[in-house]
Amino acid sequence: MILFKFFLACFSQIKSVWLTFINIFSKRETRMYPEESLSLSSRYRGRIILSRNSFGKERCVACGLCSVVCPVSCISLKKSTLKNNKWYPKFFRINLSRCIFCGLCEEACPTLAIQLISDVELSEYKRQDLVYEKDDLLISGQGKYLDYDFYKFSGVEVGTKNKGELDFESHPIDVKTLLP
């Protein structure tokens, strides 16, 4: 019995050395990140930004939907009103140390102001540096969604066209015709 355990231990050692020897010549799985670029998925959700419209004005109307839908409550903002009765965020703050990058804020935003881009370098030395203010989040461009203006489409009358006559609308359904 002792001799059997001895041969089993020797076989285990030889097998370990053999596996190590074989894997020396195989392709390395680890990537050296800064030198080798990462290939990210097209649906990757990274850093959060606030975008502007095509006229250079910020898109955010401070509706608060992003703050409400966030499961970890990492978004806080305060609404203020301009002279022309349009809302804007007086402050907009995201705590990225709490953010789970789920993308629900991007889906809830009616103006497409908040967007998640494919930036992976988000590390900081202090936790306080992971709290981003509006000036840190606001970019000069339009982000992923070009030529979209919320005020151009919301609440604008089409003119003489009835509901369902435009090419991007479907005709309204009369629910009385669906009854048995």
Swiss-Prot record:
This is NADH-quinone oxidoreductase subunit I. One of its GO terms (molecular function) is iron ion binding. NDH-1 is composed of 13 different subunits. Subunits NuoA, H, J, K, L, M, N constitute the membrane sector of the complex. Keywords: 4Fe-4S, Cell membrane, Iron, Iron-sulfur, Membrane, Metal-binding, NAD, Quinone, Repeat, Translocase, Ubiquinone. Binds 2 [4Fe-4S] clusters per subunit. Disulfide bonds: none annotated. Its EC number is 7.1.1.-. The gene is nuoI. Its cofactor is [4Fe-4S] cluster. One of its GO terms (biological process) is aerobic respiration. It is an enzyme of class 7 (translocase). The keyword Cell membrane applies. [4Fe-4S] cluster 2 binds at residues 70, 99, 102, 105.
